[in-house]
Amino acid sequence: MTADMLSHDLSLLIPELVLAGGAMALLMLGVFLKGDGTEKLVQWLTVGLLAAAALAALFLVSGEGMAFNDSFVFDSLARFSKTAIGLVAAIAMLLAMPYLQAEKLGKIEYPVLVVLAVTGMMMMVSANDLIAMYMGIELQSLALYVLAAFNRDSLRASEAGLKYFVLGALSSGLLLYGASLVYGFAGSTGFGDIALAVESGSNIGLTVGLVFVICGLAFKVSAAPFHMWTPDVYEGAPTPVTAFFATAPKFAAIVLLARVLMEPFGAVVDQWRDVIWMIAVLSMAVGAFGALTQQNIKRLMAYSSISNMGYALVAVAAASQTGLWALLVFMVLYMVGAIGSFATILSMRTREGMVEQISDLAGLAQRNPGLGWSMTALMFSIGGLPFMVGFFGKFFVIYAAVQADLMILAVLAVLFSVVGAAYYLRIVKVIWFDSSEIEFVPSAVSTYWIARIAGLATVLLLPVLGWLVFRAYSVGLALL
């Protein structure tokens, strides 16, 4: 490899290099710089590092191309995804800082693990090879396993981390087995070579391998029936970790799944569409009905996440330009709702500690009108109620399904959305019409304003929704 080639390859991976180098620097800074303010300094530097990586993906990387023997690709999809992942991870880190201080968990390892996880996510959305894909997934997963059990004094957190690790190892095994089958029958791990092998004729080995790969990736997006870990991990993990789990990793995994299906296996849509179709329906059903009986708001958000990944898979099943841009718009709007909802949950702290029951939201509109209005708007948006930005996210997904002649899937998506609205409205009812004697202590300024801004964004984003759709449409147009 010549110096020019190496320079070209590295220039396409500037965001990953910024994060990887930054993680090592933060680790050394935390070890060698002793003092009371070291943890807070590392946390603030992490926020800046994540934002810098997002901006680097948006502005610094010029052009598009392949890197390192076509193992990684930087295209419009990678640019869009890395920007979104970096920004939402920075916001999640801002949410975590007051919590870590209050719970005496302000160790330097937390921000370093977040940076390493985001590095893996950015590798995932740029993967153009099965080995590169697996490297990104494992870098992300190994960091997330530790984050889930970060509060070692909590039995629930330790249990969550263990469950996540065991089931994650199982999903990695499925993914590796599928990848080995694909490699064996295609003769290559590169997406381009796999696409040529797929186009040359039907091969049952490639199809079986793809099914295993889909199962492994379905675990990463917590799609049914590979969702078993989600409610327990969401409930047991520290709340800011749950907020992180619900946003950036889901975005990275669903984009990777879409890339794998639409690029190397784009010629055999009819062979994998039915699998995605079934997983989407199961996810929407499990999420909608599972959430109806939940009393813990973090478990409810877990089922909400499962359901929303079902809607995202509806867009993937469309396997079209419309499906791809609808997927990106839906996921961005979902992340706005999810991060705002968890900011509100983090604002509900009494003198004894965090509260997590839905009943604890009672009377929130009277005790704290700002948070009450924000949570109401966020629930309406995630539920897809009309005139909120979340409604348009679901509308575009269903439109993509209709355009792809998936009429039954579109109808089921509408029906499950109606069922899902019930548990979002239940939360709104508790906020506005129930009463409670619980007194919350004032929340951190950053947490409070993230909740407020996210709530306002569910309405204020409507004027810029056209710009977001245009950007996502440009990505779909360039790729398919």
Curated annotation (Swiss-Prot):
The enzyme's E.C. designation: 7.1.1.-
Oligomeric form and interacting partners: NDH-1 is composed of 14 different subunits. Subunits NuoA, H, J, K, L, M, N constitute the membrane sector of the complex.
Gene Ontology terms for molecular function: NADH dehydrogenase (ubiquinone) activity; NADH:ubiquinone reductase (non-electrogenic) activity; quinone binding
Entry keywords, A to Z: Cell inner membrane, Cell membrane, Membrane, NAD, Quinone, Translocase, Transmembrane, Transmembrane helix, Transport, Ubiquinone
Transmembrane segments: 12-32, 41-61, 80-100, 105-125, 130-150, 165-185, 204-224, 237-257, 275-295, 300-320, 326-346, 372-392, 406-428, 450-470
Membrane topology: Multi-pass membrane protein
Protein role: NDH-1 shuttles electrons from NADH, via FMN and iron-sulfur (Fe-S) centers, to quinones in the respiratory chain. The immediate electron acceptor for the enzyme in this species is believed to be ubiquinone. Couples the redox reaction to proton translocation (for every two electrons transferred, four hydrogen ions are translocated across the cytoplasmic membrane), and thus conserves the redox energy in a proton gradient.
Sequence similarity: Belongs to the complex I subunit 2 family.
GO cellular component: plasma membrane
Subcellular location: Cell inner membrane
InterPro entries: NADH-Q_OxRdtase_suN/2, ND/Mrp_TM
Gene designation per UniProt: nuoN
Catalytically driven reaction(s): a quinone + NADH + 5 H(+)(in) = a quinol + NAD(+) + 4 H(+)(out)
GO term, biological process aspect, one: ATP synthesis coupled electron transport
Protein's recorded name: NADH-quinone oxidoreductase subunit N
